Amino acid sequence: MIDISGHLRPYRSELGFEDNTRDFVINCCGYQHFTTKDFSRSRPNGRLDFQLIYIYSGCGYFKIDHNLIHREKGDIQIFYPGEPQEYFYYAKDTPEVYWIHFTGKNCEKLLADYDIHSCHIGENVLFKTIFQEIIFELQLKKYGFETYIASDFMKLLVC
């Protein structure tokens, strides 16, 4: 498995982070490529933040309202705060996924304004580039990086 990520804070929490004092904050962003071992994630009570998962290649399986949903390359899956999260990837499918966790008082409005929901959005190399930029900026944390990654996230919404 290849697992690359960047985080806003120097510590991590499986529950995520909630910040309703600001409009929008990216907590963390990452890339995973599963080639040798299967992977599963179970968060029965969800997280405190939002999560967007983009299937760049391969596929993944998501349990939503007791139904198993098969997501393929070019699909996104959105999880809202407190929404149960159960998903898994099989190494035989060699999935490559990008994910981002975010919080803030305007997140729901942003998703609604841009009509972002779990669906097929298609293959998009620009998505890959933007996710990689966000990961890189979260790792380096140069001056002004939070503004830069928020801008990158907006690019994801309009692509």
Predicted region positions:
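A short, compositionally biased micro-patch
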Residues: 55-57, 80, 90
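Ligand-binding loop in jelly-roll beta-barrel domains
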Residues: 82-106
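Amphipathic alpha-helical segments enriched in hydrophobic/aromatic residues interleaved with Lys/Arg
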Residues: 109-159
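Short acidic-glycine-tyrosine-enriched beta hairpin
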Residues: 66-80
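Tight coil/turn sites that cap or link beta-strands
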Residues: 36-39, 73-74, 82-84, 92
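Generic protein-terminus/edge-of-domain signal
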Residues: 1-70, 118
